Regions:
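Short, solvent-exposed beta-strand-terminating loops
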Residues: 38-59
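Catalytic cores of soluble, metal-dependent hydrolases
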Residues: 1-41, 60, 68-254
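Acidic/polar active-site rim loop that often engages polyanionic ligands
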Residues: 64
């Protein structure tokens, strides 16, 4: 962490550093502890990990949907990227996933876009707390691999979702392993709750990444964040919103 723009660099700049953890929380800590700003990140994941974020793609900016709600804006593995964006750690972000993946297969509380009908009330209410963000969402079919200078943030369920067969998992592993690229750094989260139960596949993938980048993985300890509790008023609001969002999603309305 020798430079605030480069949180996972070491004494040999040409060498790719590989971090491995059970969840994505330790990556947020790396960025925070390193004083990182304006990073470019390629995030390969079945889920967005941006719960609570509203992205205005047309104007290149983002803000929290719930501007000051401590419960909805809590940090965890489902929102760490939202906080990384809002704190200025990340200003260029690409979210890459399989065709079976992304918002259509995520839970109700995933990232919102400016074109979403469900985002309209929050846009009407306004808000001055926008931060700059260049954002693109892509499937593997349109992805050409990490770009020079990008950090690769990879959630194992982006390659090995729990419903996938091993053949499909190996096809997606090749999207990473068979490409020629040298990322600024690599972070892999296991995300056992959502990934394929065969641990040997994950371990094999890490071993092959070590070989690909001629490095040894740095295993980071687990990290948990205080979750807090929702207020009574938020619980009442949530009951109504959950019902409305679920009905909209069934009709493919965002």
């Amino acid at each position: 962490m020798s430079h605030p723009e480069d949180p996972i660099a070491d004494s040999a700049p040409a060498k790719t550093v590989l971090f491995v953890a059970e969840e994505h929380g330790p990556l947020y800590d790396l960025w925070q502890e390193g004083g990182c700003r304006n990073l470019s990140v390629c995030h390969v994941d079945f889920h967005c990990d941006m719960r609570g974020l509203l992205i205005d793609r047309r104007h290149g900016r983002a803000r929290f949907v719930w501007q000051s709600d401590p419960f909805m804006n809590r940090i965890d593995s489902g929102s760490f990227l939202a906080h990384a964006v809002m704190n200025g750690f990340v200003t260029n972000l690409r979210w890459v996933h399989d065709e079976f993946g992304g918002r259509s297969h995520d839970r109700l509380y995933c990232v919102k876009y400016e074109s979403d009908l469900s985002a309209l009330p929050f846009r009407i209410l306004g808000g001055k707390n926008w931060v700059p963000l260049n954002f693109v969402e892509q499937t593997f079919a349109k992805w050409e691999g990490p770009r020079p200078g990008e950090y690769l943030s990879l959630d194992w369920d982006g390659l090995a979702f729990s419903a996938y067969q091993e053949d499909r998992i190996r096809e997606l592993m090749s999207e990473i392993l068979d490409r020629e690229f040298t990322p600024a750094g690599v972070f892999v989260a296991h995300s056992i709750e959502y990934c394929h139960p065969e641990r040997a596949l994950f371990d094999e993938f890490i071993t092959r990444l070590e070989k690909k980048f001629a490095t040894q993985a740095v295993r980071l300890p687990d990290k948990s964040y205080p979750q807090g509790a929702p207020s009574l008023s938020w619980q009442r609001y949530h009951q109504i919103e959950h019902f409305v969002l679920r009905g909209m999603r069934k009709r493919n309305i965002w």
